[in-house]
Structures are given as C-alpha cells and as structure tokens.
Amino acid sequence: MIVRERADGTLILIGQTDHAKLSGQCAAHWGNQYFAKPKPYEAVVRAAMFHDSGWYDYEASPTIAADTGKPLNFMQVTWGKPQRRAFEWAIDWMTRIDPYSGLLLSKHRTGLQRGRYGKMTSPKAFNTQNLPEDNEDFLERNEEAQAAALRNYDEAEFWTNYQLLQTFDFISLFLCNKDTLDDVIEPVPTSYDGKAPLARLTLKTVAGTKIAVDPFPFDNDPLRVQLVRREIGRGAFADPAAFREAYFKAIPVAVDFMLCSP
C-alpha cells in the first residue's frame, strides 16, 4: 500500500493492485512511430496490469506501525514467509493464465531484490528493503524456475520487456507518490531489434494532473489514465482494527491524469 500523509495529517492510500492497474493502462497504450508496441502485446500488458497481485493478501488485512500507529507504506512491509507465499501464489496464478506473463511477473519480483538486475539506471528508488535473512531461498528457487522457463523464449526480447515493465512501474509509482513530478526514467527501450537508441524519459508536471512526457511514448496524445485511491481524515490509529475499519469505510476516489507531449 502506498501511504501519503498530507500536511494536515490526513492520508492518501493507494493499493499496490490499484497502482498496478495504472501501470497496465500505460502498457496498453505504449507504442507509436518512435516507440515499439509491446510484443507479445497481451502478455506484456497483462504482466504490467497484475504485477503486484501478490499484495492482495496484505490489502485484505493491512496494518499499522506499532510505534506510531500510522499505516505501513509498502516499503516498510517485511517480506516474511506469509508475504513471500502470497508473491509465489501470484506468480503461479499468472503462469497458469499465461506463462510469459508469469515469467515477467516473477522476474520483476526477484528483480526488486537484485537492483532490477542493473537494467535501469534511473530512478534508484523503490527497490525492496526489509528483507529477512531467510529470503535467499525465495530468490534461488524462483530464479532457477525463471532460467528454465526463459529457454522457451527469445532472451533479448524478454529483457526488453522486463525493462518496459520497470518503466510502466516507475511511471505509475511517480503518479501515485507525488503531486508535482520532475523525474527521469532510463534507459527505456524504443525497439526490439536493438538498433534504435534507448530513451531517457522525463516526466514533468504542467499543471495539476497534466503531465508532460518527453519523448512521448503513447498512442494517444494526450492520453487519459485513471488511478483509484482512498482518503482518510486522520493519520494515526489506536490499533490495526481501527485503521482497517477506516480504510474499509473510505470511499474510493478516481483521479484522472492527462499524459501529453511537451
């Protein structure tokens, strides 16, 4: 869960699964004369849209920090065995639907613990912290399965799609976490043949929720995308049950963003 505290102490709460749906919208519209459309299209878009499905368990019973009473941001949640089981459930679920999507989802999950495999130089934020000592088994088991699955696909194409998935993830995370954007994502693939140069994508707030993206990678200009979030009128709670009651009662609010060329 993405937790943003306003100056007045009220909260904006965004489920990881809602953030992922925003990533999926970006993936679905990716591609124009300068940027290659994702391929295989459905598999890449599906992976982006559901890449954080492993957070459903936590979102069903979110909690607070014991010392502050404030809801935990996703970067504060420890990847203990229950959370790792939820991640592996999501990988298995997606793999049953589409093995390629499942492989992308799995590689994304382990990549968060491996510095995104060095494939992205900017931003450096949003990599996983709070890893338990016994997490290496999770990594080894899933990376072994990934290596076996990857033999069925074009490896260069897969890593291009991995970079694209990170790009969709970052765009959504920026939109979810900030009111004013002035950010960079790189390197961003523009083709699958490796001949076209990689892009340095900038995102800057024009006004309100209108965001300029340069170079512009989408099929519609401007592109309207939507995020669902919740707002709560207090920042701290006496116990987890009090927070969950407020969270469950909060009315979902749809926020539209307009992504445009500079």
Whereabouts are the PLM-identified features?
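Divalent metal-dependent catalytic cores for phosphoryl transfer on phosphate-bearing substrates
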Residues: V3-I14, G24-Q25, A43-K178, D182, ...
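Non-catalytic terminal regions of proteins
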Residues: K124-P262
